[in-house]
């Protein structure tokens, strides 16, 4: 964003790099003492590593999604210590394929879409996230969770460059191998989970307020720059 503004001849001293306020909201929402809704009553966070899955994008409808779900079936069958939690999009085309491929698989929890608060707290308690969502690519890494992106391209290339997310597409073999790699290789897992999130550190709102106060003369200096 800063490069784009500079390319448009916005003066550098008019630009404040603050990070994204979505990360602030995330940190305010996630709580250690959060109590999950009733649909989580049969989910054991202590005994299972949680794989959180979301899929909804139109380009993945049909066979691409089916391949993803077949890979999830393999993972659930191979790793008895994982539980797959899948808030299923309400699109009937998504639900039909999900039920066909995962409806009878032990430790695969197919639930209705979640509001932001339970979803954010579920991300915080997950081991690994597989998604074709955009926002999750920012939020998951802020919680130290590797994110495997079920797409060929992303509008968030900074996350790929930072190593917090990885584009893996929807091919069954690739989804299976990439997820399995992170579930079995501690060093690979740490490399992603400990990479610096390029989208914020939870202090964006404070920096924005300080920038505004500086602009109107209430402070004699702007906020420190957010650096990923």
Located regions from the model:
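A nucleotide-sugar donor-handling region in carbohydrate enzymes
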Residues: 1-63, 168, 188
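C-terminal amphipathic helix plus adjacent low-complexity
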Residues: 184-228
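Donor-nucleotide binding loops and adjacent catalytic segments primarily
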Residues: 32-125
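Short, acidic/turn-prone active-site loops that include or flank metal/cofactor-
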Residues: 113-116, 152-155, 172-173
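Short acidic-hydrophobic, aromatic-tinged amphipathic segments that line or gate anion-handling sites
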Residues: 16-17, 109-112, 166-171
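A donor-sugar binding/catalytic signature common to diverse glycosyltransferases
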Residues: 121-160
């Amino acid at each position: 964003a800063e490069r784009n503004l500079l390319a448009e001849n916005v003066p550098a001293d008019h630009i404040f790099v603050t990070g994204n306020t979505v990360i602030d909201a995330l940190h305010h929402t996630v709580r250690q003492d959060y109590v999950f809704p009733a649909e989580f009553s049969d989910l054991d966070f202590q005994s299972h590593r949680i794989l959180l899955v979301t899929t909804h994008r139109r380009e993945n409808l049909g066979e691409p999604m089916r391949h993803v779900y077949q890979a999830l079936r393999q993972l659930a069958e191979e790793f008895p210590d994982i539980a797959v939690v899948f808030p299923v999009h309400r699109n009937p085309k998504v639900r039909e394929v999900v039920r066909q491929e995962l409806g009878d698989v032990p430790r695969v929890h197919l639930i209705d879409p979640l509001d932001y608060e339970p979803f954010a707290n579920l991300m915080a308690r997950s081991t690994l996230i597989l998604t074709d969502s955009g926002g999750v690519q920012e939020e998951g890494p802020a919680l130290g969770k590797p994110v495997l992106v079920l797409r060929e391209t992303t509008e968030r290339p900074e996350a790929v460059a930072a190593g917090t997310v990885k584009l893996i597409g929807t091919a069954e073999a690739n989804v299976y191998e990439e997820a399995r790699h992170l579930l079995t290789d501690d060093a690979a897992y740490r490399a992603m989970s400990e990479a610096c999130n390029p989208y914020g550190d939870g202090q964006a709102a404070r920096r924005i307020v300080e920038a505004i106060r500086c602009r109107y003369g209430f402070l004699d200096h702007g906020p420190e720059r957010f650096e990923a």
